[in-house]
């Protein structure tokens, strides 16, 4: 009830993703997410929204759309017929808020730092590169201020790295930044990342021809 911050949120847990990594199908992950969603709603009296591959309707697939209004606005949003929760009560939990549960592809959290303290520029670049603004498919982005460093950041979530590569987000951000006379001063990956996403990016910048994951030593060892 007293939390503040730059990143959108609608609950204490906020989101629970089910990600098929190995020896499991997306269909199995979807079924499990729905089973857990029903149990969470019942056991904890918590409104549950199914999202991404588990979504019960197209307008619920995008987590940003589900989160819109955030914790403070969810009490009114949840009253709308199109935003009734899939499981649980029809009003937010007093302290836990609401939660989104669903199956999805591995998400790559990728941030690009800009040599400007102007947050409006970071916001504008984010709007240009994200899919909802006419940019890259499977790309979500927002501008963030890094006060301690005196710079800003384009914070990106790549929701399907197999369809839209990391280097495309990096290069499009570079192009848009030039329009403001701004440069990229670094980037970072938050959390875990699939090896394939990094190999794909390295292959692009090195100009490798006919390269495949089968040539990666660690990948071959793991297969054994």
Which residue stretches match the model-derived regions?
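Long, contiguous binding/interaction regions
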Residues: 1-224
């Amino acid at each position: 009830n007293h939390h503040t911050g730059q990143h959108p949120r609608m609950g204490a847990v906020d989101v629970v993703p089910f990600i098929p990594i190995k020896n499991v199908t997306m269909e199995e992950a979807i079924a499990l997410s729905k089973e857990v969603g029903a149990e969470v709603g019942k056991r904890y009296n918590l409104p549950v929204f199914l999202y991404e591959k588990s979504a019960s309707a197209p307008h619920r697939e995008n987590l940003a759309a589900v989160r819109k209004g955030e914790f403070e606005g969810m009490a009114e949003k949840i009253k709308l017929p199109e935003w009734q929760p899939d499981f649980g009560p029809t009003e937010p939990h007093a302290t836990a808020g609401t939660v989104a549960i669903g199956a999805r592809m591995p998400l790559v959290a990728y941030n690009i730092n800009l040599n400007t303290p102007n947050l409006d520029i970071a916001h504008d670049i984010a709007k240009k590169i994200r899919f909802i603004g006419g940019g890259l498919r499977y790309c979500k982005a927002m501008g963030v201020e890094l006060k301690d460093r005196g710079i800003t950041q384009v914070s990106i979530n790549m929701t399907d790295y197999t369809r839209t590569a990391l280097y495309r987000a990096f290069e499009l951000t570079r192009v848009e930044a030039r329009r403001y006379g701004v440069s990229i001063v670094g980037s970072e990956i938050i959390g875990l990342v699939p090896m394939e996403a990094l190999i794909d990016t390295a292959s692009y910048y090195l100009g490798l021809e006919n390269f495949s994951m089968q040539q990666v030593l660690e990948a071959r060892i793991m297969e054994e």
